[in-house]
C-alpha cells in the first residue's frame, strides 16, 4: 500500500491490469463471430466508427500527455483490437452480401419495365433531362 496525502492506495489492483480482460473479450468476440458468421448483422458500422474514434482519442491523449508506458501500450492494443474487429466486420459483410445477391430474384425481369424505371430515375435525379427524353 502506498500513502498518497491522507489516503492509502492499493497499487496491486490498479486500472492498468485490464489488458488481460481485453484479450479475453477479444478472443471470445472473434470466436463467436467466426462460428456464427453474422458479425455484420450483430454490430452496426456507426457503432464501430464511434468505438474506433473513442480508442483513437484515447491513444492520442495518452501519447500527447506523456502517460505511463502501460497506458500507451493498452491504447495501442485497443486500436489493434478495433482494426481486427473492423476487418472481420467488413469480411463478413462482403461475404454475406454476395450470398444475398445470388439468392435474390430479379426485380424487373422484362426489358420494358427496366427501361421505364430507368427513365423515371433519370427524371428524379436529373430534372433537366425530362423535357428532352420524351420528344
Swiss-Prot record:
GO terms for cellular component: lysosomal membrane. It comes from the Eukaryota. Gene3D superfamilies: 1.20.1280.290. This is Putative uncharacterized protein SLC66A1LP. Transmembrane segments: none annotated. GO terms for molecular function: L-lysine transmembrane transporter activity. Signal peptide: none annotated. It comes from Homo sapiens (Human). The lineage of its organism: Eukaryota, Metazoa, Chordata, Craniata, Vertebrata.
